Amino acid sequence: EPVAQGRPRFSNHGGFVKAYDPAKSRNGKQHVRYAAKHAMEGETPLLGPLHLKAEFGIMMPKSQARKRTPRTREYRVKKPDLDNLLKLVKDGCGGVVYLDDNTVVMITARKIQCAQDEAPFTRVSFEEIEPLSDASS
């Protein structure tokens, strides 16, 4: 199940305020990092300008499941926000797929609600793209 980056939490220990990730976000980042390390298997991190392509399949709420006419895929216009899903993926891939998230210069993403018989998923790919030419249009 895709996980969105949660708001930071704060705690006070001995007069010092400490910010930390919620457990769900922390575990989601670890899962993304593990999958990224497995996919990269000894490859060096990408350096140039990158195009991030992502697709998130969110599970259908149980209240919408139908027995006679199963529901098909559709765009998900409810929570979680697409930008928060992307933040978690970018944070999890940092240092593994690329060294600096500033190298991601283009993003193509969509968030859908899975069909009734489909498992939730996250698909991510990174592609190095050509730098813009110096010629002005």
Residue positions per predicted region:
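Acidic, proline/glycine-enriched N-terminal capping motif
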Residues: 1-137
